[in-house]
Amino acid sequence: MKVSVLITLAVLGVMFVWASAAELEQSGSDQKDSDSPAWLKSMERIFQSEERDCRKMFGGCSKHEDCCAHLACKRTFNYCAWDGSFSK
């Protein structure tokens, strides 16, 4: 019983943060700077997707720079595969 209550509260908290970030994203930039608290502005960054110009796992490539981080272009069939690294 206690576990289900804690899980429910955690899910509600995540939904609140997600909804707040989505609302913040929809509002104009003028309103975003003046009305919202600083912690909400920082939470917005979590829900924004990164737009990268790279190929993901098993994507076609011609050189290593075409692939995303921790991926390398395999010469055999020209696809991006894990390069074996773990660091940032």
Swiss-Prot record:
Q: Where does it live in the cell?
A: Secreted
Intrachain S-S bonds = C54-C68, C61-C73, C67-C80
> What is the reported tissue distribution?
Expressed by the venom gland.
Supply one GO molecular-function term. Answer: toxin activity
The positions making up the signal sequence are 1-21
Q: What is its main location?
A: secreted
List keywords of the entry alphabetically: Disulfide bond, Ion channel impairing toxin, Knottin, Secreted, Signal, Toxin
What SUPFAM superfamilies does this protein's entry cite?
omega toxin-like (SSF57059)
Work out whether the entry's keyword set contains Cytoplasm. Answer: no
Q: Which GO terms of the cellular component aspect does the record hold? A: extracellular region
Q: Which residues form the propeptide?
A: 22-52
Q: What is the superkingdom listed in this entry's lineage?
A: Eukaryota
> What's in the domain note?
The presence of a 'disulfide through disulfide knot' structurally defines this protein as a knottin.
Q: What does the protein in this record do?
A: Probable ion channel inhibitor.
Family label:
Belongs to the neurotoxin 10 (Hwtx-1) family. 41 (Jztx-36) subfamily.
Name it.
Answer: U13-theraphotoxin-Cg1a
- This chain's source organism reads Chilobrachys guangxiensis
